[in-house]
C-alpha cells in the first residue's frame, strides 16, 4: 500500500460514508450490508435513493473504518457485488 496525502488528512479510526450505485433491486441494500458486516461488523441503516427512471439505486451508509487499507478492502468487496456499478 502506497503512502499518500490521504493518510495525513484522515485520523483513524473514523466514520467514512460509502455511496454504492447499482441496478435497482430489493436485495441490493441487504447485499451491501452483508459485505459490510463481513469486514466491519456494526448496526447499519443504509439510505436508499432511486434514480429518476427507477433503473438504479444509490445506497449511502456510514462505516467505522480503522485504516486506509480497511477502506480499500471495503471498496473492493463492495465493487464485487454483481449488481453494483460504482462505489464512491
From Swiss-Prot:
GO cellular component, one term: cytosol
Pfam families cross-referenced by the UniProt entry: DUF493
Lineage, broadest ranks: Bacteria, Pseudomonadati, Pseudomonadota, Gammaproteobacteria, Alteromonadales
SUPFAM superfamilies: YbeD/HP0495-like (SSF117991)
Family: Belongs to the UPF0250 family.
Stored NCBIfam families: PRK04998.1
UniProt organism field: Idiomarina loihiensis (strain ATCC BAA-735 / DSM 15497 / L2-TR)
Annotated protein name in UniProt: UPF0250 protein IL0958
HAMAP family the UniProt entry points to: UPF0250 (MF_00659)
Gene3D superfamilies tied to this protein: 3.30.70.260
